[in-house]
Amino acid sequence: MLTHKTCQARKKMQVSFVIRDAEEKQHRNGVNALQLDANNGKLYSAGRDAIIRVWNTRTDSSEKYIQSMEHHNDWVNDIVLCCNGRNLISASCDTTVKVWNAQKGFCMSTLRTHRDYVQALAYAKDREQVASAGLDKAIFLWDVNTLTALTASNNTVTTSSLTGSKDSIYSLAMNPSGTVIVSGSTENILRIWDPRTCMRIMKLRGHTENVRCLVVSPDGNQVVSGSSDGTIKVWNLGQQRCVQTIHVHKEGVWSLLMSENFQYIISGSRDRNIIVTEMRNPSNKTLVCEEQAPVLSLGYNIDKTGVWATTWNSDIRCWKLPMYDRCTLNSSGGMDAQWTQGGTEVACIKGGAAIKECAVLNDKRYIITKDSQDQVVVYDVLRVVKKEQLGAVDYEAEVKKRNKQVYIPNWFTVDLKTGMPTIVLGQEEVDCFSAWVSIEAGLPECVDPTTEIKINYGKLLLEALLEYWTPPHSIPPNEMEPDMHGNGYFQVPKHTPVIFSEVGGRTVCRLLVRDAAGDSESTLLHETAPQWVTDVVIEKNIPKFLKIPFFLQPHPQMTKPERTKKDRLVANEFIQCRKVCEHVLEKVLNAETTPSGGNANNSLQNSQSDANSEGSQLPAEERIELWCNDVVVDPNMDLRTVRHFIWKQSTDLTFQYKTKQNFNYDGK
């Protein structure tokens, strides 16, 4: 017997997975941050689809994709390149900060210090120091050389924290020498610390809404801030005041980029505009471009003649920057200053479509989605695959056409936050073991016509997701018995990411289906998988059946009713109404039946009875008619479907029965 080491005993856990291709070369949602390695022309992009991608900006080809860096399972909000491009640090809504080998693209370590979304990072190049901040109001300082030296055995890291923030932090900046760190938050103020001593220096007031972006001058004397209030402010830290307020945008300013001499501001806004402004003379400004969606981040190209921009959409575009020419001769012989031509799109990294709408069909196996390009797709949740690409068809009409009159309890939820369908299994509001179905309905391709088997969707799926997991210290299988892995019916794609996380909280474990066989992954699963998962995957326990109470009484049109009282019965909710017909014949009318399992009373309790035993020539459903709410019930309907579509009441389901005209129960 395997002894399961319960982890997070006080935390309720959920399991989620993403239905996706083995390699997703395009961003499937907005892109939150950019970092350019100018030495080798690599552009790193942090996606809302939870993936960091690397692009070759030196090629003129449309195929710029190099590789993906995957280990987050929620939006990647910020990234910084460090150690001369050897390493990358990322911050995510999954509450983690991750350290990456930027060249090989793998995650080296995960920092779990934050307790909420990590929104921003700051980097002091000269000191190799990184700061992280987020919605938990915390700021942590990290020594990059220590982080990159972490190993499985040497996995202890210390951090300094900057205290005093009273609200969620959305922006963070340091100068290269690491003498000043500035944070912006929903307090609408700037807080300044000395990261060398972790001492608070000052706070600056002036913005009226969230401070979304910050840049600190190299000497640490000036700060430029952008806010949701639509303004850009320039602050002098020596004077501890705002020395310039710039109004060039109609909506919030979400991204800032400074020229090397700290004289020009390139700003991106929710109003979709990218604008260059002279800091000392804000009236001297020019529009670089109008993007297709609100601008999330900006970054220079290699020679700084253009700027890469990301938005709510998944495309990444590079725009030519206009230059400010002060040496233009005017008609009077004097010198004029003017902007040279800019705003031309010089490169584009195309993104993919994000799923925006999703409908779970009544069979609770398939979902239909509609993406940002109006493409409609059918996904098979149970097999974790895309089933059918329908194209730009009428989404609502497809949902209506494919919905059958069948009721199966919800056993999963769908999250579209990343732009790809993430399926969530749990034991809270939605019980992943609530969906029992007959095998001919759930897996018609696996039907054995000689048996009537009930399957549980949640159990089968968990067994498939963790098929390769062999827990440490488990007892080897008996040589006479097969080593049971998986569910015996189907497998899911091996590249599928599986995530264990706290309900409404942080990620505990992420792995691919195929990697569960690894020693470290197996040990991690053993320590983190909740008991309700190991019960079905390892112990092979059967989830409990859900019961439905119902009343059974004669129909008013019964010519010779044996009784008039109501009988209150309880049966598994997936029992078909033909079983109720058999019960009426055998137990109520005492007629000969063609039972579905020998004893009609047992048929109400046992879902796996045999429907082919010998008996009377006519089956029960051809001799007995069931009514509910003045509607004749299809004998193939199960109890839960009748309750949902016909009964439609919170009180106990009530059936009325009567004999059909061609059957006289007195004449046996």
UniProtKB/Swiss-Prot annotation:
CDD domains: Ubl_WDR48, WD40
WD repeat boundaries on the chain: 26-65, 71-110, 113-152, 164-203, 206-245, 248-287, 290-329, 350-389
InterPro entries given in the database record: G-protein_beta_WD-40_rep (IPR020472), WD40/YVTN_repeat-like_dom_sf (IPR015943), WD40_repeat_CS (IPR019775), WD40_repeat_dom_sf (IPR036322), WD40_rpt (IPR001680), WDR48 (IPR051246), WDR48/Bun107 (IPR021772)
Stretches the record annotates as Disordered: 592-616
Gene Ontology molecular-function annotations: ubiquitin binding
PROSITE patterns according to UniProt: WD_REPEATS_1, WD_REPEATS_2, WD_REPEATS_REGION
UniProt-listed GO biological process terms: double-strand break repair via homologous recombination
Keyword annotations from UniProtKB, A to Z: Repeat, Ubl conjugation pathway, WD repeat
Biological role stated in the UniProt entry: Regulatory component of the Usp12-46 deubiquitylase complex. activates deubiquitination by increasing the catalytic turnover without increasing the affinity of deubiquitinating enzymes for the substrate. The complex deubiquitylates the wg/wingless-signaling receptor arr/arrow, which stabilizes the receptor and increases its concentration at the cell surface; this enhances the sensitivity of cells to wg/wingless-signal stimulation.
Family named by the database record: Belongs to the WD repeat WDR48 family.
Assembly: Catalytic component of the Usp12-46 deubiquitylase complex consisting of Usp12-46, Wdr20 and Uaf1; regulatory subunit that, together wtih Wdr20, stabilizes Usp12-46. The Usp12-46 deubiquitylase complex associates with arr/arrow; the interaction leads to deubiquitination and stabilization of arr/arrow.
Entry protein name: WD repeat-containing protein 48 homolog
Species of origin: Drosophila simulans
Native organism taxonomy: Eukaryota, Metazoa, Ecdysozoa, Arthropoda, Hexapoda
